[in-house]
Amino acid sequence: MKNLVVVDHPLIKHKLTIMRDKNTGPKEFRELLREITLLLAYEATRHLKCEEVEVETPITKTIGYRINDKDVVVVPILRAGLVMADGILELLPNASVGHIGIYRDPETLQAVEYYAKLPPLNDDKEVFLLDPMLATGVSSVKAIEILKENGAKKITLVALIAAPEGVEAVERKYKDVKIYVAALDERLNDHGYIIPGLGDAGDRLFRTK
């Protein structure tokens, strides 16, 4: 798992523990997901390049640094990734936003694309793919495939919780994709849920169960 970075921080551990609690309601769950994504983004964006700019302080002129966030593309996987996008956009408000919709066929267990709306992608764009739960890796692998087919070269996957099986699936297919997570959990159960995990993130976010 050489491409995996587990962001080890007391704030993340604290907030993630509250999210795992089955008694945490959807409002707090959404807020915590946004906050943790913001903290993950601090590390996941560390490789972004800065350009020198001249600024004038109240006292004198000096050289500062600026990220060209117009070269950043944020792509949540629908639907649970939507809340994560808000966290990154707080830091990079001028980033473009794309959306990818994927579901898993219950018969074949293969990922099926049902929606994709992406801004123009090229070698210079820094793409951040967002999905709270990296479980089997099927959805993430399919989303990366879609991004690459549309011209993306620099892709970073940001997830809340990952299972070893999901990380290995992504690394096996795409060795150039870095993965940032808040926690690496034990394993998947027979139904493809992460153990201990936090349940179905989409259902808990949008109260659909």
Curated annotation (Swiss-Prot):
Q: What is its EC number?
A: 2.4.2.9
Q: Tell me where the transmembrane regions lie.
A: none
Q: How is its activity regulated?
A: Allosterically activated by GTP.
Q: What is the free-text note on the cofactor? A: Binds 1 Mg(2+) ion per subunit. The magnesium is bound as Mg-PRPP.
Is this entry keyworded Metal-binding? no
Keyword list, A-Z: Allosteric enzyme, Glycosyltransferase, GTP-binding, Magnesium, Nucleotide-binding, Transferase
Q: Identify the SUPFAM superfamilies for this entry.
A: PRTase-like
Q: What positions does the entry give for uracil binding?
A: 194, 199-201
Q: Which cofactor does it need?
A: Mg(2+)
Pathway this chain belongs to? Pyrimidine metabolism; UMP biosynthesis via salvage pathway; UMP from uracil: step 1/1
Which Gene Ontology MF annotations are present?
GTP binding; magnesium ion binding; uracil phosphoribosyltransferase activity
Tell me the domain of life: Bacteria
UniProt xrefs under NCBIfam families: PRK00129.1, upp
Fetch the HAMAP family from UniProt: Upp_B (MF_01218_B)
Describe the task this protein carries out.
Answer: Catalyzes the conversion of uracil and 5-phospho-alpha-D-ribose 1-diphosphate (PRPP) to UMP and diphosphate.
The UniProt entry, under PANTHER family, shows:
ADENINE PHOSPHORIBOSYLTRANSFERASE, URACIL PHOSPHORIBOSYLTRANSFERASE, CHLOROPLASTIC
Q: Which family does the record assign? A: Belongs to the UPRTase family.
Name of the protein this chain belongs to = Uracil phosphoribosyltransferase
